[in-house]
Amino acid sequence: MALKLLFQCSPCSPSSLAPLQPVLVLVRPPSGAKARRNLRCCASTQVTELMTARRSANYHPNIWDYDSVQSLTSDYKAYTYLERVEKLKEDVRRTLQEAVGLLDQLELVDCIHRLGVGYHFDKEIKEILKTISTEPNNMGLIDGDLYAMALYFRLLRQHGYEVPQGVFNRFMDDSSSFKASLCNDVKGMLSLYEASYLALEGETTLDEAKAFTYRHLRGLKGNIDSNLKGLVEHALELPLHWRVLRLEARWYIDTYERMEDMNPLLLELAKLDFNIVQNVYQGQVRKMSGWWKDLGLGQKLGFARDRLMEGFLWTIGVKFEPQFAQCREVLTKINQLITTIDDVYDVYGSLEELELFTKAVDRWDTNAMEELPEYMKICFLALYNTVNEIAYDTLKEQGVDVIPYLQKSWADLCKAYLVEARWYYSGYTPTLDEYLNNAWISIAGPVILVHAYVSMIQMITKEALLDCVGSYESIMQWSSMILRLADDLATSTDELERGDVPKSIQCYMHENTASEVVAREQMRARISDIWKKMNKDVALSPLPQPFKAAAVNLARMAQCMYQHGDGHGNPHRESKDHILSLVVEPIQLMES
């Protein structure tokens, strides 16, 4: 690779790692030409510094000021609010117990979940659904009611019960197509559309249901109830099964308030609970902001993205419930380290430096730091100390040494980063399969999920760790692959412009001589297919339910964060609005 010097040599400082100030510009060499990557610049007899070519990503600056983050607070930690929530929970619990009709029970359970307060009633909801699943006469009660049948199917599948796709055969004609008369039942069509996203591989009836309902819901005309119309538009933008739970709760609270059959006590509980949990988030993000400032990595490595608030948003998406505060704090730290190290590999480090850093992480030994340049020493030590501290807390609380598993996940990540760096520096375009076999690891999903596991699962054993994270369970692969493809769909063009390895879209185009439009459609189809695989794992995997939920939620968060562009690397209006709604701005309560 040829290097082009753009300035007069002057005294060089290894600590000057500011963005937008590349020392040299990279120019790809002609095919077969040898790359010359390093230039020694001597400004005086006392100062001799090896100059290495640096790329610039032109990332947007951090939009969340430290002092503003530290000032976040609310009144919803007051005892009067907490006392009121406990009273409302008892009222809603009584409502659950008194609901007797099958459809009434299903609608109440669905509403409680969508409002974000289902975690308060896990025991009651499990008992209701268990009873519903074992009652032989239930099919007869909702036979012919598409809305009720689809709601029954979706809720039971969401909670791990086996419900065959054949329950929808009664809504199909002799040619195995859905009856045209169903198009008049908008509520039923919407319910079937949402249910179709719980499909497993090979369930062609549900594939047909999705295509049929999507086609007709898209073409709705005439006078439709405004609330129902809003629900349809919301579902067509992104189905409920793919949505981030806490963001969905915030949206649905506003929607539910406008419904004629709204339960005011349930609505009040949802609003109060949202604000109280938001207060928990504010305390956490203040703590994490202080940790990040004290770590000093953002100030020292000015080329890297500073995305603390966006990183914290990811953790809410993965586990929003207040009892998983430790998991969110661990993942916030991990997200910051991932973002920084990703920028070291993608933007700042030379290939030689990246080889050394990968070896250091693989060895997990501070002695390996000796060969690293100064900025990498800082980065490695921040990683080493943070991960070891997480492992120490786990050892102290559970008596299990998790360092080998955490270290392995980081070593695998850095090795995957290095593969992509080698591809970039050699100008190599991998096949799509070759790319994806590496890319589901390089997107850092396994690192996130391994750390999520050790920070939220009680009674960890070495055997369970080995089964779960030692070889990366398939549910981790599916979640990570959705994360990768969603990222590629949003960021591949920008990443190629700043200099990066071809992504899945470009690999498909190169391998199949296809247009970008076709390649993007293929990646979206892959995401849909992978969701079916993950649905199966959620139902059948013996892994702890909180961990399976975290894996699913990571995929949901990916599709949210990259739905309108790169909501992490270059935060857009939507990601800012998500942070404001979940962390900053409480829901206004009605005056009593």
From Swiss-Prot:
Q: Which family does it belong to?
A: Belongs to the terpene synthase family. Tpsb subfamily.
Enzyme class, UniProt record, top EC level: lyase
Q: What is this protein called?
A: Alpha-terpineol synthase, chloroplastic
GO BP terms: namely:
diterpenoid biosynthetic process; geranyl diphosphate metabolic process; monoterpene biosynthetic process
Q: Which residues bind Mg(2+) 2?
A: 342, 346
Q: Using the UniProt record, give the first listed, main subcellular location.
A: plastid
What's this protein's function?
Answer: Monoterpene synthase converting geranyl diphosphate into alpha-terpineol. In vitro, can also have an sesquiterpene synthase activity, converting farnesyl diphosphate into (E)-alpha-bisabolene (33.1%), alpha-bisabolene (18.7%), beta-sesquiphellandrene (15.8%), beta-bergamotene (12.6%), (Z)-alpha-farnesene (10.4%), and (Z)-alpha-bisabolene (9.4%).
Tell me the domain of life: Eukaryota
**Organism of derivation:** Magnolia grandiflora
SUPFAM superfamilies assigned to the protein according to its UniProt record, in alphabetical order: Terpenoid cyclases/Protein prenyltransferases (SSF48239), Terpenoid synthases (SSF48576)
**Catalytic activity line of the entry:** (2E)-geranyl diphosphate + H2O = (S)-alpha-terpineol + diphosphate; (2E)-geranyl diphosphate + H2O = (R)-alpha-terpineol + diphosphate
How many and how are cofactors bound here? Binds 3 Mg(2+) or Mn(2+) ions per subunit.
Q: Where along the chain is Mg(2+) 3 bound?
A: 487, 491, 495
| Transit peptide stretch | 1-42
